[in-house]
Each structure stands twice: as structure tokens, then as C-alpha cells.
Amino acid sequence: MKTLVLLSALVLLAFQVQADPIQNTDEETNTEEQPGEEDQAVSVSFGDPEGSALHEKSSRDLICYCRKGGCNRGEQVYGTCSGRLLFCCRRRHRH
């Protein structure tokens, strides 16, 4: 079941990468930081809506951000956003 969750995350990431427009070479050489480019929030959830054991144990919600430079403590790189930003995710804490 953990494999299914991982594959789902990879498929979601692949769709996101394909949905991003291809950057022009002029944009890639521009090094000025654009407002709102850093720390764009994305929420990703996996699991059975009926609250199965899979949802409770192995597919906790992820909180993801597109970050410039590197992921914060507790986050892992899951890919890229728009080619230049890192797609960083961490597990949401459950109470």
C-alpha cells in the first residue's frame, strides 16, 4: 500500500511538471527574484476518505511548497516547480 501512495505522488508530480509552460531562454537568464515566487503553498492529500488503516498509518497528508534555494528542516525534495524552484514536502502533524 505504501508503494501505491508513492506511485500516486509521483504521478501527481509528473502531471504538475507537464502542466507548467516551457520557459523561454530570456526568462531563464533573468536572475531577478519575482514577487511571490518563493514559498508557494501546495497541499497534497492521499488516502481513503472512509478513514482506512492505510490513511491512518502510511498516507498522512503532506504539506508542500515551491522553494528557492533549498528545503527547510523536516522537508524533503519531491521534484521541481517551474524548473527553478524545489518542490519541498513535509508530513502534516496530526493531533
Swiss-Prot record:
Chief site of localization: secreted
Keyword Signal on entry: yes
GO cellular component: extracellular space
Record field: compositional bias (Acidic residues): 25-40
Domain of life: Eukaryota
UniProt keywords, alphabetically: Antibiotic, Antimicrobial, Defensin, Disulfide bond, Secreted, Signal
Signal peptide: 1-19
UniProt-listed InterPro entries: Alpha-defensin, Alpha-defensin_N, Beta/alpha-defensin_C
Subcellular location: Secreted
One biological process term in Gene Ontology: antibacterial humoral response
Span list, region Disordered: 22-57
Residues cleaved off as propeptide: 20-58
Any Pfam family: Defensin_propep
Cysteines engaged in disulfide bonds, as pairs: 64-89, 66-81, 71-88
Function: May have microbicidal activities.
Protein family per UniProt: Belongs to the alpha-defensin family.
Protein name: Alpha-defensin 20
Gene of this entry: Defa20
